[in-house]
Amino acid sequence: MTPKKGKKRVKKNIATGIVHIASTFNNTMITICDASGNVISWSSAGARGFKGSRKSTPFAAQVAAGDAAAKAMEHGLKTVSVVVKGPGAGRESALRALSAAGLKITLIRDVTPIPHNGCRPPKRRRV
């Protein structure tokens, strides 16, 4: 078998970064970038093995945030500013998981897009 070809992950030494939490009704995605926007690590509830409706739970967001934080701290990340987007259930639990992992949060910014009467929303569910 030929040896596996691919980029060897270079260990960067980054002290501060930006965490983007995209929380939808179906999933929670966490991306950790440096100051210029290069991705250091990422994780999501689906990537951590949650399937279907379990992806949208706060616990799945907590696991995904802890995983992304652990990967980023291998590169020397210590302080982060957080950008939260979306209406999902995993917003607060992802924030708590980041601080519990040992990252110092300096700023929390909510950039959830709010329409000024744009597209028609999906119809209401009748259960």
Swiss-Prot record:
Which Pfam families does the record associate with it?
A: Ribosomal_S11 (PF00411)
Q: Which domain of life is it from?
A: Bacteria
Q: Name one GO molecular function term.
A: structural constituent of ribosome
- GO biological processes: translation
Sorted alphabetically, the Gene Ontology cellular component annotations on this record are: ribonucleoprotein complex; ribosome
Q: Enumerate the PROSITE patterns for this protein.
A: RIBOSOMAL_S11 (PS00054)
What's in the keyword line of the UniProt record? Answer: Ribonucleoprotein, Ribosomal protein, RNA-binding, rRNA-binding
Family, per the entry?
A: Belongs to the universal ribosomal protein uS11 family.
Q: How does it assemble?
A: Part of the 30S ribosomal subunit. Interacts with proteins S7 and S18. Binds to IF-3.
Known HAMAP family for this protein?
Ribosomal_uS11
Q: What role does this protein play?
A: Located on the platform of the 30S subunit, it bridges several disparate RNA helices of the 16S rRNA. Forms part of the Shine-Dalgarno cleft in the 70S ribosome.
Q: What is this protein called?
A: Small ribosomal subunit protein uS11
Organism, by scientific name, is Anaeromyxobacter sp. (strain Fw109-5)
